[in-house]
UniProtKB/Swiss-Prot annotation:
Entry-linked PANTHER family: CHLORIDE INTRACELLULAR CHANNEL PROTEIN, CHLORIDE INTRACELLULAR CHANNEL PROTEIN 6-RELATED
Superkingdom field: Eukaryota
Native source organism of the sequence: Rattus norvegicus (Rat)
Quaternary context: Monomer. Interacts with TRAPPC2 and RYR2.
GST C-terminal domain mapped to chain residues: 76-239
Name this protein carries in UniProt: Chloride intracellular channel protein 2
Physiological role: In the soluble state, catalyzes glutaredoxin-like thiol disulfide exchange reactions with reduced glutathione as electron donor. Displays weak glutathione peroxidase activity. Can insert into membranes and form chloride ion channels. Membrane insertion seems to be redox-regulated and may occur only under oxidizing conditions. Modulates the activity of RYR2 and inhibits calcium influx.
Length: 245
């Protein structure tokens, strides 16, 4: 196991367990692990991160969380294992005024990218080369939907008293200029798609999707995302056996 601590102030005792990389120490490829990692970082709470080598589960893990794979969390000595419930718990418990709310204001911010990863998975696992174009088209349709949403101004961006009509959004992220739970869910998956689809399908997100690229550029500039991403090789290794070229 490898541990690192992120210190800010006196807080609850929190330890997040995430999947380790191929070296057994670094951060591994697990979008759900990264999702919780980002949430805790954005909350501004003090917490420890421990990487778990799932290939060689340490003895202490068998006692701590038998039959459980990362991510899981210990909050004030209480084990929590369902990542969706963990997310809900953290949003409810680490709340204002001390900690920021991360829930998005607009429901579509959560919904808009919900099919992207499934389309990518079908594309990367396809074994019939002649069908690749159809799978790619399905993936591109989902990227177009995301791009349209990111380029369409939210209600918060529209000034009813202005004589200028804003036709193109300038916001940084899905729900505005702050990262939210919606970004914590989508961004780890987008990073996987960008890396694995390029490696095994020579697929690049088209430059014409300016909203998607603006979003990714802004996201990689934030340490809460960039510093929780696995190395590209970890993503490539994950898909090496399933990507039928």
């Amino acid at each position: 196991m490898a541990s690192l601590a992120l210190n800010t102030q006196a807080d609850p005792e929190i330890e997040l367990f995430v999947k380790a990389g191929s070296d057994g120490e670094s951060i591994g490829n697990c979008p759900f692990c990264q999702r919780l990692f980002m949430i805790l970082w954005l909350k501004g709470v003090k917490f420890n991160v421990t990487t778990i080598d799932t290939a060689r589960k340490p003895e202490e893990l068998k006692d701590l969380a038998p039959g459980t794979n990362p991510p899981f969390l210990i909050y004030n000595k209480e084990l929590k294992t369902d990542f969706i419930k963990i997310e809900e718990f953290l949003e409810k418990t680490l709340a204002p005024p001390r900690y920021p709310h991360l829930s998005p204001k607009y429901k579509e911010s959560f919904d808009v990218g919900c099919n992207l990863f499934a389309k990518f998975s079908a594309y990367i696992k396809n074994t019939q080369k002649e069908a690749n174009k159809n799978f790619e088209k399905s993936l591109l349709r989902e990227f177009k939907r995301l791009d349209d949403y990111l380029n369409t101004p939210l209600l918060d961006e529209i000034d009813p008293d202005s004589t200028e009509e804003r036709t193109l959004s300038r916001r940084l992220f899905l729900d505005g200029d702050q990262l939210t739970l919606a970004d914590c869910s989508l961004l780890p998956k987008l990073n996987i798609i960008k890396v694995a689809a390029k490696k095994y399908r020579d697929f690049d997100i088209p430059a014409e999707f300016s909203g998607v690229w603006r979003y990714l550029h802004n996201a990689y500039a934030r340490e809460e995302f960039a510093h929780t991403c696995p190395e590209d090789k970890e993503i490539e290794n994950t898909y090496a056996s399933v990507a039928k070229q």
